[in-house]
Amino acid sequence: MKVLMFGWEFPPKIYGGLAVASYGITKGLSLQGDMETTFCLPKPCGDEEKFLNIIGMNQVPIVWRDVDYDYLKSRLSTSTPEQYYAFRDHIYSDFSYMHVNDLGCMEFAGGYPGNLHDEINNFSIIAGVVARQQEFDIIHAHDWLTYPAGVHAKLVSGKPLCIHVHATDFDRSRGKVNPTVYAMEKNGMDHADCIMCVSELTRQTVIHQYHQDPRKCFAMHNAVYPLSQDLLDIPRPDHSKEKVVTFLGRITMQKGPEYFVEAAALVLKRTRNIRFVMAGSGDMLDAMINLAAERGIADRFHFPGFQRGRQVYEAYKNSDVFVMPSVSEPFGIAPLEAMQCGTPSIISKQSGCGEILDKVIKTDYWDINAMADAIYSICTNPSLFQYL
């Protein structure tokens, strides 16, 4: 079976959990033997693994240009002249009014720029060229950013569309939904033949908030791959005198970072032998630094910034407790990664991963007293640490 997949992130360029999930799914499909995946990205870096076919949408022409073969070889970093010409033969409309480069291709910033909605629209236009040129059996679109591309590919090809709901705007916004994003999400769901949700929690949101037929909505939980030996060999420091409690993720409203800081303040009223780490970046970072200072715990708080690759697992190994106090977490793969590293986890009851995890402590995200009790208990009770 051939899958035409649309995604917005892919390792080694990681902006969040979407890249990790996209990698895991495509890697798993590649091991099936009878699956061939073509993954469309706005702007590949060229260092992606080669177990799947990657199409850089920034190197697919939408305006016809008479370009020399040798010039193409020098200009195309992640594609070939042959592929360029094949796509050029399937340009389906006059897009000369669009802003394109000398190859007739659209440029993408990559990631999540200020003109994100423009890039989503451009991505879907290019998807029309790709869907006309490629041979495939099914379309798979990851998250709202690529739903328009998936819908366009379905309308062009008539092939079934599976959308993968990693999160909804209800999760990201605490209910203050962006109507434009909601409309894109609902349009993708309405056109989808199958809706894959990362948890039953998310499935219920899709059914009730987006008014979808339960018969086409399925909960498909995320998972993690076994760690490589070099990551398993990362040593755990001796924290017999001073424990380390870590929050690792985007420092945004959805992730509940303020509840972590407030719980830390309660714990530090009982003992000063614990350090707290808030690793990540986001629009609430400065506010959390200020909140830690206001609570008088800045000397016990560390903000190391965004962690990549091996740094993530070093952070887990360096922790005695991992805390994920998300307000609304469709799944949340970080606790699974922490547990792989032998680090006990505390998660909010509003997290989808709680549906499959037993040996974790679960509290309501807003219950900072329960969260503080759990942190203190794990840090002071070696038996509980070993059990978890």
Predicted feature locations:
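Short alpha-helical donor nucleotide-sugar binding micro-motif in glycosyltransferases
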Residues: 306-307, 314-319
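A conserved catalytic-core segment of Leloir-type glycosyltransferases
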Residues: 35-131
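Conserved acidic donor-binding segment of nucleotide-sugar-dependent glycosyltransferases
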Residues: 360-369, 377-382
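Conserved donor-binding/catalytic core segment of Leloir-type glycosyltransferases
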Residues: 196, 238-264
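Carbohydrate-associated surface elements
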Residues: 201, 223
